[in-house]
A protein has these predicted regions:
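Conserved Radical SAM active-site core
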Residues: 6-152, 162-163, 175
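Hydrophobic faces of well-ordered beta-strands that scaffold small-molecule active sites
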Residues: 39, 95, 128-130, 153-155, ...
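A structural motif corresponding to the C-terminal end of an alpha-helix
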Residues: 120-126, 180-192, 246-263
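Active-site glycine- and acidic-residue-rich loops that bind
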Residues: 130, 135, 199-209
Length: 280
């Protein structure tokens, strides 16, 4: 990594003991159930960021990575070879990188599965939508800039407060590092977005205005979502009336700041607009 990327790394992230395992896979691309994506690609099972609210744990097919979330990371060692074959025969479309892991978690620094997959997909005229919490994505800035018309990058920003970040996302880079990386990407002309979620009542819901203002300063759009349990309990209780009021506040704030804003559920509409650009 160059010094600029190193300078955006978190200074004090909780250090967790990680067990790395390797497997061979038969497929690289999976049909996505999200309307805005055609495929998903997950280079790893498990995630070192260990976010307490993460739904991916429930949908991770590798039992040990799911049961020991944040401790066991499974590397798909033959992913690149499999992907090279798949892109020759599947229909081109939009690939989500990634949907049940963070593609730029620390193990990617040495394994390079995300970078190599990104190069393959973009060279074959697929579109790629990246979502991460890590400024390690800046390592691949050369690839992203070269193919900027076919890629977008979203950063999850759940909170701006250190105490909330450390509680909810103990292994993830801090919000400052994410925001600086988002600024850099946006400044390079890459389509960026800020995922403000999950919005959790009594924990980070008082920060939505501040995060929206920050997105406005960067010049990026907002995608938002509330906390959905998916079998995960944080000891919190939702309230339909609370969320309806909070969503109105989010939309009003985005309008006042002058940025595009939509819910996670509506994200497919934005992607449909992109589809009017030629895929071939």
């Amino acid at each position: 990594l160059d010094q600029e990327v190193l300078d955006t790394q978190p200074d004090e992230v909780e250090t967790l003991l990680i067990v790395l395992k390797e497997i061979d896979v038969k497929t690289a691309l999976s049909k996505s159930k999200l309307r805005e994506l055609d495929y998903s690609l997950n280079p790893y099972y498990g995630c070192q960021f260990s976010c307490l609210y993460c739904y991916a744990r429930k949908f991770t097919p590798h039992e040990e990575a799911s049961d020991r979330w944040g401790e066991v990371i499974v590397v798909k060692r033959n992913l690149v070879e499999v992907l090279l074959k798949e892109v020759q025969r599947v229909r081109r479309g939009t690939v989500g990188l990634s949907t049940i892991t963070d593609p730029y978690q620390p193990v990617e620094g040495s394994r390079l599965l995300t970078r190599r997959s990104l190069e393959i997909l973009l060279s074959k005229d697929f579109r790629v939508s990246i979502q991460t919490k890590s400024p390690l994505v800046l390592r691949d800035l050369d690839v992203l800039v070269r193919h900027r018309e076919r890629v977008d990058v979203g950063f999850t920003v759940t909170t701006l407060r250190e105490e909330v970040w450390r509680r909810l996302e103990p292994g993830a880079p801090g919000p400052k590092a994410r925001i600086e990386a988002l600024k850099r990407l946006s400044g390079e002309g890459i389509d960026t977005w800020l995922f403000m979620g999950p919005v959790i009542r009594g924990m980070n819901d008082g920060e939505v205005r501040d995060i929206i203002v920050l997105a406005g300063e960067i010049g990026t759009r907002i995608v938002y979502d509330k906390f959905n349990e998916y079998g995960i309990s944080l000891g919190l209780r939702g309230d339909k009336g609370w969320w309806e009021a909070k969503e109105r506040e989010i939309l009003r704030s985005c309008e006042e700041v002058g940025i595009e804003c939509h819910s996670e559920v509506e994200d497919w509409i934005h992607e449909e607009r992109r589809r009017f650009l030629p895929l071939f």
